[in-house]
Amino acid sequence: LKKNLKRANSELSLDIEFSHTAMETFLSSLPLFQSLVLDKFAHVFWKLKRTHLKFYYAIDVNTNQALATLMYVKYSKKAYLLFPYTSEEGKKRQAMSFLINALVEDDSIEIVDFEGSNIDSIANFYAQFGAVKQEYWTIHWKKSFFPYW
């Protein structure tokens, strides 16, 4: 991880206030983001963007192009990762490692909630930054147990 971060730090820059037009263009060009967020919840997304969502972008220092984005919500001193995305070029250049490391090093954030992963490779990636598995309780009931509902 240290070697990858050293390389990424020399090739990438962190941008927190990417221009609105450039951000829209970048996010709209992502098929996954388009299908999961914009097609179903565009009005909610843009409203949240103005109030609660935070973004980190990994920018190529030579071309000034965004290679990755890390979307999160910050509440108090806790950051909740919502949508980490890396382009193919960003993957080659460790852009997500660069962004997560920047988030972890942010003094205004004490806890980063990686929002878990059932995919081992992703869970292992997050573990490099100190993520630990957290078990959560769930409650499930059948309506037949509650005949008056």
Q: Predicted regions: what is each one?
A:
Residues 1-91, 128:
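A conserved beta-strand-loop-helix scaffold within acyl/acetyltransferase catalytic domains
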Residues 52-147:
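Aromatic (often tryptophan-rich) hydrophobic motifs at membrane interfaces
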